[in-house]
Design a protein with these regions (language model features):
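Conserved cytosolic headpiece of P-type ATPases
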Residues: 1-502, 509-510, 523, 534-537, ...
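Hydrophobic, aromatic-rich cap/lid helix
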Residues: 277, 559, 565
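Generic alpha-helical transmembrane segments
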Residues: 480, 525-526, 548-562
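Membrane interfacial helix-start motif at the N-side
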Residues: 514-515
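Helical transmembrane-bundle signal
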Residues: 522-525, 529, 558-561, 590-594
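Membrane-helix interface and helix-disruption motif detector
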Residues: 539-545
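Active/binding-pocket-proximal capping segment
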Residues: 546, 566-569
Length: 650
């Protein structure tokens, strides 16, 4: 009866991989740490595993695909184009009309456009060292190192402040000497913003926003210093210029104004009517240098990138094509089209669409739902409060760490510390590496446990004494198996991981023949161990020595086998051992600890072992080495069969 109880306990201990939960937790924790070092902060742990399944990344254009460093490049006023020089937020630059430098202070129409952009604004231009006294900057000559200029607020508005500063508008008057009487803030639905100021001639409203929206609200247009009626022909001309500027990748805003009587409560509703159009302003937001490469990397990994932006369709298409995100055959859809589309029609179009322009948060939600209906695993970026529903609906919601709101970050599974699209691709890459590593140590631990179970089961079936006692099995599962398994979680990314298609989300961990590998390789380890036990028992007739030989043979077979688990896609000879020094260290420590369990007198009493002699080690090395060689043979046979099967299918 005692022998039967021991057999049952030993089989139970052998069947349960005690170290597996701890190793899974360590793998996920290390993965989160690695992602954090690459600026991807994981807020919800399941996202780590889901990242490896992502098939579509829906990314905002501004700040994620581009630098979010707006610079005014062009004005269109009174039928003329005015170029603006300068880079970034430094308030130095010139104004050129037909290639000739002009002083904006002498151009009343241009100055009004600059003034509207400058004062219809909440952003602040600052330096990262002591601020200098504000003064006209048009003629300022730079001496010495250029100061670092920064924008506090929205970069689009910041670009308009910089343009005004280039023309000599005094920075110190903003927000102090000339405070607005009232503000009608920007809203994604309205696509415009208005600020009302009190000037010497009374109240004046300055308005900026999407050209198609502002033009529809204008009844007049400023031409050659006179206000003319806004005719249908003028509307078409302005919108044509808007399309031209947008097709060059510029973000275009329309600038307008109107004089107001004294305001009463309900008068605010009519402020943004009967406006006078002053002109258009085009701003450049250069793409991030690393994004083009990251988009190509994602494409090679079977991950499609979709641009979602509030900008004009032509602006979005220009940027998308410059990044290699959209080709000639790809669809681009604007928000107005989305409004008129049924869900079924959107379902048809979304598969071939790479760009969505002039979208609002409700559109984002519909796009995510349509992509998910096609079976895609969707990652969606967002920064505003209204983006939270779309982020929650996505499989991986991604918030912006620099520009995002607290509400969006709370709803997201991941936060980008640098607001960079390349970080999303890096996180997908890490997600695949983590999943690969989880499969590696599951393969290792379960094959080792299968070998232990088979050893015990065969001995019981054929009537042999128990080859292993429970304490020996626990020692292997928790110590000599556990350390190499943890080291496998630190394996670097397979260079070919991003050339494979995303795995199916419902794909089990034992897919792609992993279960068969575990079973076959567990059989090999088990046969080696039981053979070592039988040979030692037959030669010496000492049960304790035979158990020690079987115990040590099993440990050595497992320590050899761990190197076979480093890759499912490469042979052992193709993997560089030096890329995971932790594994080498773990194997060395596990081997040393096994020697202590065999030779240390105190440990011998605990683990029921005896000191082994040279002949015992010959048996151990021959059989554990044979198991390693046989694993290689089995793997080669499996690859050959797989290759021939694929050729036959073709």
């Amino acid at each position: 009866p005692i022998e039967m109880i021991m057999s049952g306990v030993s089989l139970a201990v052998a069947a349960i991989p005690e170290g597996l939960p701890a190793v899974v937790t360590i793998a996920l924790a290390l993965g989160v740490q690695r992602m954090g070092r690459r600026n991807a902060i994981i807020r919800k742990l399941p996202a780590v595993e889901t990242l490896g399944c992502v098939t579509v990344i829906c990314a905002d254009k501004t700040g994620t695909l581009t630098r979010n460093e707006m610079t005014v490049k062009e004005f269109f006023i009174g039928g003329k184009r005015v170029e603006v020089t300068g880079v970034g937020y430094a308030p130095y630059g010139e104004f050129l009309m037909s290639g000739q430098r002009v002083d904006p202070r002498c151009e009343e129409h241009l100055m009004l456009a600059l003034k509207i952009g400058f004062y219809c604004n909440n952003s602040v231009l600052t330096q990262n060292r002591k601020k200098e006294t504000a003064q006209p900057l048009l003629s300022r000559q730079k001496t010495g190192p250029a100061p670092k200029w920064e924008i506090l607020g929205d970069p689009t508005e910041g670009a308009l402040v910089v343009a005004g500063a280039k023309a000599g508008l005094p920075l110190h008057t903003r927000g102090t000497h000339n405070s607005p009487v009232h503000e009608i803030p920007f809203d994604p639905e309205r696509k415009r913003m208005t600020m009302i100021y009190r000037e010497s001639k009374g109240l004046v409203a300055y308005t900026k926003g999407a050209p198609e929206v502002i033009v529809s609200l204008c009844t007049g247009i400023l031409e050659s210093g006179r206000v003319l009626e806004m005719s249908p022909g003028e509307r078409r001309r302005i919108l044509s210029e808007n399309s031209r500027m947008a097709s060059q990748g510029l973000r275009v805003l329309a600038l307008a104004y109107r004089h107001l009587p004294e305001l009463r409560g309900k008068d605010l509703e009519n402020v943004e009517t009967n406006l006078i159009l002053v002109g258009l302003v085009g701003m450049e937001d250069p793409p991030r240098e690393e994004v083009r490469k990251s988009i190509a990397l994602a494409k090679g990994a079977g991950v499609r990138t979709v641009m979602i932006t509030g900008d004009h369709l032509d602006t979005a298409l220009s940027v998308a094509r410059s990044l290699g995100l959209a080709g000639e055959g790809d669809l681009a859809i604007c928000g107005a089209e989305l409004d008129s589309m049924t869900d079924d029609r959107l379902l048809e179009c979304v598969e071939n669409s790479r760009v969505f322009a002039r979208v609002n948060p409700e559109h984002k939600l519909r796009i995510v739902k349509a992509l998910k209906a096609h079976g895609h695993i969707v990652a969606m970026t967002g920064d505003g409060v209204n983006d939270a529903p779309a982020i929650k609906e996505a499989d991986i919601g991604i918030a912006m760490g620099l520009s995002g709101t607290d509400v969006t970050r709370e709803a997201a599974a991941m936060v980008l510390a640098d607001d960079n699209y390349a970080t999303i691709v890096a996180a997908v890459e890490e997600g695949r590496a983590i999943y690969d590593n989880i499969r590696k140590f599951i393969r290792y631990l379960l094959a080792c446990n299968a070998g232990e179970v088979l050893t015990m089961l065969v001995a019981v079936i054929i009537g042999l004494p128990l080859p292993l006692v429970p304490i020996q099995i626990l020692w292997m599962n928790l110590v000599t198996d556990g350390l190499p398994a943890i080291a496998l979680t630190m394996d670097p990314l397979d260079p070919q991981a991003m050339s494979r298609k995303p795995r199916r989300p419902r794909e089990g961990v034992f897919s792609e023949g992993l279960g068969l590998k575990i079973a076959s390789q567990g059989v090999i380890i088990g046969i080696s161990t039981i053979c070592a036990f039988i040979i030692s028992l037959a030669l010496c007739g000492e049960i304790k020595r035979a158990r020690t030989v079987a115990f040590t043979c099993l440990v050595m077979a497992q320590l050899i086998y761990v190197f076979h688990c480093r890759s499912e896609y490469h042979r052992l000879s193709e993997t560089d051992l030096r890329t995971n020094i932790y594994l080498i260290g773990a194997v060395a420590i596990s081997g040393a600890m096994q020697l202590l369990a065999v030779y240390l007198p105190v440990a011998q009493g605990v683990f029921h072992t005896v000191a082994l002699d040279g002949f015992d080690w010959i048996i151990i090395f021959l059989l554990s080495g044979w198991s390693g060689i046989f694993v290689v043979i089995i793997e080669k046979a499996r690859r050959l069969i797989k290759r021939r099967t694929s050729v036959i299918r073709v």
